[in-house]
């Protein structure tokens, strides 16, 4: 993506889940949206959006989900449903290029929007930063956010699997994914002979 993009919207979602796959993939629901608006020229954060979302298909969070995300049943029980959060996210990200680390977040937004009978809040334009980072690094395979942070010499901040913290960490990788900073060569575990 060129530097002519005015703003990037980094989105990270957390969704209902369980360790035994009792919740079918097409029934997972967003429980937290973390989004960071980033200036396209400077790549500096401009503003944040963060909201818990109350699930309706599987309203009770599994113990695994709570352990993984640190999101409690109380957090989501008091939250608005996706139908009410989606327009706020759309307004927040208006005219920005929607970005996420991988395709999952885009697919989950589309799935929740379909379930509610509403339009996808962020439209069709999407930049998969996981793919962009792999291309910039010259890698054939993609890596997770934390592995990418370590590769460029950054320490992860915040709590992993929390929407806004993960969005902030992804934003720190934006200059590398866009090719504005070089991605260091991957280190190997092999020792020189």
Model-derived regions, located:
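N-terminal accessory regions of nucleic-acid-interacting proteins
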Residues: 1-13, 18-20
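Metal-dependent phosphoesterase core characteristic of DEDDh/y 3'-5' exonuclease domains
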Residues: 2, 6-7, 26-33, 37-69, ...
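Glycine-rich, highly charged phosphate/nucleotide-binding loops
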Residues: 75-84
């Amino acid at each position: 993506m060129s530097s002519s993009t005015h703003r990037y919207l980094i989105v990270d979602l957390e969704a209902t889940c369980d360790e035994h796959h009792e919740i079918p993939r097409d029934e997972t629901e967003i429980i937290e949206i973390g989004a960071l608006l980033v200036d396209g020229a400077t790549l500096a954060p401009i503003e944040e959006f963060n909201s818990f979302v109350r699930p309706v298909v599987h309203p009770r969070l599994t113990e695994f989900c709570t352990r993984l995300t640190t999101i409690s049943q109380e957090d989501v029980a008091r939250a608005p449903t996706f139908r009410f959060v989606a327009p706020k996210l759309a307004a927040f990200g208006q005219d920005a290029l929607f970005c996420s680390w991988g395709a999952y977040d885009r697919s989950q937004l589309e799935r929740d929007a379909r379930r509610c009978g509403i339009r996808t809040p962020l439209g069709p334009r999407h930049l998969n930063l996981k793919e962009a980072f792999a291309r910039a690094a010259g890698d054939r395979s993609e890596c997770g956010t934390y592995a990418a942070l370590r590769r460029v010499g950054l320490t992860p901040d915040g709590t992993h699997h929390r929407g806004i913290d993960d969005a902030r960490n992804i934003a720190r990788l934006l200059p590398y994914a866009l090719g504005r900073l070089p991605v260091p060569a991957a280190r190997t575990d092999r020792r020189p002979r």
